[in-house]
């Protein structure tokens, strides 16, 4: 079961990373998107999820 759980974590990490990259790209192309409150909330949430996931993986591997 551990292997399946790891696979799901990797898939979710990749999806979050791809979505965050696309949203950051669109933000550079059209900076007026930052005026949209929900766009900013979603972008911050995706980046936060990536940071927490990375920290969780580092914590699991060190201990």
UniProtKB/Swiss-Prot annotation:
Chief place of localization: host cell
Organism of provenance: Acidianus filamentous virus 1 (isolate United States/Yellowstone) (AFV-1)
Name the record gives this protein: Putative transmembrane protein ORF63
Highest taxon of source: Viruses
Extracellular membrane side: 1-8, 53-63
Compartments where located: Host membrane
Topological relation to the membrane, as annotated: Multi-pass membrane protein
Regions of this protein lying in the Cytoplasmic compartment: 30-31
GO CC annotations, alphabetized: host cell membrane; membrane
């Amino acid at each position: 079961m551990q292997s399946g759980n790891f696979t799901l974590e990797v898939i979710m990490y990749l999806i979050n990373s791809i979505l965050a990259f696309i949203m950051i790209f669109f933000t550079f192309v059209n900076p007026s998107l930052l005026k949209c409150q929900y766009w900013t909330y979603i972008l911050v949430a995706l980046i936060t999820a990536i940071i927490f996931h990375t920290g969780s993986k580092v914590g699991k591997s060190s201990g």
